[in-house]
Amino acid sequence: MERVRDLASEKAAVIFTKSSCCMCHSIKTLFYELGASPAIHELDKDPQGPDMERALFRVFGSNPAVPAVFVGGRYVGSAKDVISFHVDGSLKQMLKASNAIWL
């Protein structure tokens, strides 16, 4: 979990994904369309990916474990959570507050 914690705080917006996950792709696209440039960690391409995926599942309990989205170093949630925050307008506010976007 320490590696996940370190990576999650490396940038204002961080997304843990898998390259074959359609919801991960959707969340990445949403962030790009909002003007954010998140750090993307594709767990299926990282040698420590399976361990990080297990840690994400253990700590946050979402199944599947990806996408796992962090803003300002804090866990925001999975795709369902992020979409809900986007619909109610709070995702953009989170991104602004963490300096992931400026407008």
UniProtKB/Swiss-Prot annotation:
A cellular component annotation (GO) from this entry: cytoplasm
Predominant location: cytoplasm
GO terms of biological process kind: negative regulation of transcription by RNA polymerase II
Listed PROSITE patterns: GLUTAREDOXIN_2
Protein keywords: Cytoplasm, Disulfide bond, Electron transport, Redox-active center, Transport
InterPro entries for the chain: GlrX-like_pln_2, Glutaredoxin, Thioredoxin-like_sf
Top-level taxon of origin: Eukaryota
Location relative to the cell: Cytoplasm
Glutaredoxin domain location: 1-102
Disulfide partners: 21-24
Pfam families reported in the protein's UniProt record: Glutaredoxin
Record-linked NCBIfam families: GlrX-like_plant
Family listed: Belongs to the glutaredoxin family. CC-type subfamily.
PANTHER family, sorted: GLUTAREDOXIN
Function: Has a glutathione-disulfide oxidoreductase activity in the presence of NADPH and glutathione reductase. Reduces low molecular weight disulfides and proteins.
Protein name as annotated: Putative glutaredoxin-C12
Phylogenetic lineage: Eukaryota, Viridiplantae, Streptophyta, Embryophyta, Tracheophyta
